Amino acid sequence: MNITATILLAFGMSMDAFAASIGKGATLHKPKFSEALRTGLIFGAVETLTPLIGWGMGMLASRFVLEWNHWIAFVLLIFLGGRMIIEGFRGADDEDEQPRRRHGFWLLVTTAIATSLDAMAVGVGLAFLQVNIIATALAIGCATLIMSTLGMMVGRFIGSIIGKKAEILGGLVLIGIGVQILWTHFHG
């Protein structure tokens, strides 16, 4: 795979994380750049590892991985999105009374895993091609780092406009990504 194809693949794989990061950034009250970078680093690290894991699985048992990865991503994203929506409605009355909670490490990791399962499936496919899997995985991770950090900052702007309803919007974005993953699986 040439450098152009690798870069296009990398940024294509980062789009789910970008969308999820917009939702995350919107739910926080003015996230700092350091929080955006932390999110980008977590999403980027997970997105670097998942194609490597997928590649390894592709060498072993590609059929099982491809059969179930979309369902796993769907369930995780529906759960996380539903949780965000519930939190958004639960806190709608006391919007200015307390600052919004920060996203914990494990919540970010879970979201990153849910949005990166497609990269694992790509890794399975790459196992059957002549590619430098390390360079490709690093490119995907770097693109995701950039796009997730940018997504958090875009989300910051959106969140400052729509306030607490941003948590509901963020949950809807995650659910939308989950539905899109399932739709793509069934309708190509």
Curated annotation (Swiss-Prot):
Keyword Ribosomal protein in record: no
Protein family: Belongs to the MntP (TC 9.B.29) family.
Annotated Gene Ontology cellular component terms: plasma membrane
InterPro entries: Mntp/YtaF (IPR003810), Put_MntP (IPR022929)
Keywords: Cell inner membrane, Cell membrane, Ion transport, Manganese, Membrane, Transmembrane, Transmembrane helix, Transport
Pfam families: Mntp
Cell compartment(s), UniProt: Cell inner membrane
Name of the gene this protein is made from: mntP
Keyword match GTP-binding: no
Spans through the membrane: 3-23, 66-86, 106-128, 143-163, 168-188
GO molecular function: manganese ion transmembrane transporter activity
Source organism of the structure: Escherichia coli O127:H6 (strain E2348/69 / EPEC)
Membrane topology label: Multi-pass membrane protein
Protein name: Probable manganese efflux pump MntP
